[in-house]
Regions:
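Long, low-complexity intrinsically disordered regions
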Residues: 22-23, 27-53
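Active-site-proximal beta-alpha core segment in soluble small-molecule metabolic enzymes
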Residues: 60-68, 72-83, 93-250, 254-261, ...
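Active-site anion/phosphate-binding pocket segments in diverse small-molecule metabolic enzymes
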Residues: 2, 49, 54-86, 90, ...
């Protein structure tokens, strides 16, 4: 079987549980049942499927560098990720709970995060690109995988190779997907993404009725999910939230019988009308606060430490770092630490005489970061410490009370940016 000049090796679809719509009893006529990957019969309920589900895959560690060859280490607590997923799943019940693991699981490692979540009971994953879907498939052989960025021209065969599901956001993609399924007798599933207010990706709402009629006329339509995306879920009082929920409720009625998904991490903490059949948290899994409350309901996941290379005395009136932006107002003791913006530690976290910057933890005490963050190094004012420090001592940049949300504030960015920019010059450790 050929697609262009590339031979297509189509895997036999796996039997997996998938989100089920919660309005089946409301249907006055026969519902549109989402087909199984084989296209034969409606999917079974998750409880029945779980009874005969295969054992979870073994834990898969990611790639790392030797500790002796780098200046910093990054520890990811996979147990905390799994617990965060359980917390979110409980909050969203009876909706099913997926996991978004795009961007290398927000910088935490697709393979270890996916295998930990699969072991915790998660069986549906969302990624941005097909290359990420391949990694998820290797770590969770029985998972349902959706690819948010959809089908690039000529790439439909890639989805068939690993039994991944495209999230279709325009009619061109839908035409290509239908043609591929017809030519190759492929019965794999897909999602339809409708734009309800983000004005980014998604089919126009005006197309929903005609597409729903088309789906009703095709017994093996392959549409396993309809979805949209909230633009302002992190602002609970924003009027667009309720407008999007109302518009999506209308779409869901048109596609009665097909599971529906709207809520992201913050959307889970809106009222339950945003939950529908499947929620898809991302940033909250990795320890960021998905609410506007000061108390974070998520467990911290990431700890970032770097080694102290040198401690030195700086006379009063002397400056530190590029641009001479920070001036010692007294005789000061500073520590030079082996991490910088090349490692993803944001340059705006540095400070100047006019602006306070971020902090790090040394010997259990918070100390200010001073001067500019440079490519490989930063400086910390440790004058207030009462104990001696030594070359090779650890300094904590994330952890010991410093979370990704606080660091994002120092960097004048968002928590997503903090996590996904963390680089690969670390010795990485995955706790599980």
């Amino acid at each position: 079987m050929l697609f262009g000049r590339r031979k297509v090796r189509v895997q036999k679809p796996k039997s997996v549980a998938t989100a089920q719509p919660r309005d089946e009893a409301e249907s006055p006529t026969a519902a549109i049942e989402p087909p199984t990957p084989d296209g034969d019969a409606p999917a079974t309920r998750p409880e029945a499927e779980a009874e005969r589900a295969p054992p979870p895959p073994p834990f898969v560690a990611g790639e790392t560098l030797p500790a002796a060859e780098v200046g910093a280490d990054l520890t990811i607590d996979c147990t905390a990720v799994a617990q965060n997923w359980r917390t979110l799943a409980s909050r969203a019940a009876p909706a099913d709970c997926a996991a978004v693991v795009k961007a290398d699981a927000y910088g935490c490692g697709i393979e270890p995060i996916t295998s930990s979540l699969a072991a915790a009971g998660c069986n549906t994953f969302f990624v941005a690109h097909i290359a990420e879907a391949r990694r998820v498939r290797a770590a969770a052989p029985n998972a349902v995988i959706y690819v948010l960025n959809g089908i690039a021209p000529g790439s439909a065969h890639c989805f068939a190779e690993i039994d991944a599901r495209p999230v279709i956001g325009n009619l061109g993609e839908l035409t290509e997907w239908d043609a591929f399924r017809t030519v190759h007798s492929w019965h794999g599933g897909a999602a339809l993404h409708f734009d309800t207010g983000m004005n980014r990706l998604g089919l126009p709402i005006e197309e929903a009725a005609s597409l729903a009629g088309r789906v009703r006329s095709l017994p093996n339509h392959g549409i396993a999910l309809v979805m949209s995306h909230l633009a302002c879920a992190d602002e609970p009082r924003h009027p667009l939230n309720q407008k999007q929920i109302r518009d999506f409720q209308e779409i869901r009625i048109m596609f009665r019988g097909v599971p529906a998904s709207l809520a992201n991490s913050a959307g889970i903490f809106l009222d339950s009308s945003a939950h529908f059949d499947l929620v898809r948290p991302g940033i909250a899994l990795y320890g960021a606060n998905p609410t506007v409350a000061n108390v974070n309901p998520m467990r911290p996941v990431v700890e970032l430490r770097a080694r102290m290379l040198q401690a030195r005395i700086v006379p009063e009136g002397s400056t530190v770092g590029y641009g001479a932006t920070w001036t010692a107002k007294r005789v000061s003791r500073i520590a030079i630490v082996s991490i910088g913006y090349a490692d993803g530690y944001s340059r705006p976290i540095g400070s100047s005489d006019a602006r306070r910057g971020g902090e790090a933890v040394v010997q259990g005490r918070r100390c200010p970061i001073i001067g500019r963050v440079s490519m490989d190094l930063l400086a910390i004012d440790i004058t207030e410490l009462t104990k001696d420090v030594h070359r090779g001592d650890w300094v904590t940049l994330l952890g010991e009370g410093i979370g990704v949300d606080e660091m994002a504030g120092w960097a004048r960015t968002i928590n997503y940016d903090v996590l996904t920019r963390l680089g690969h010059r670390f010795h990485r450790v995955w706790k599980h």
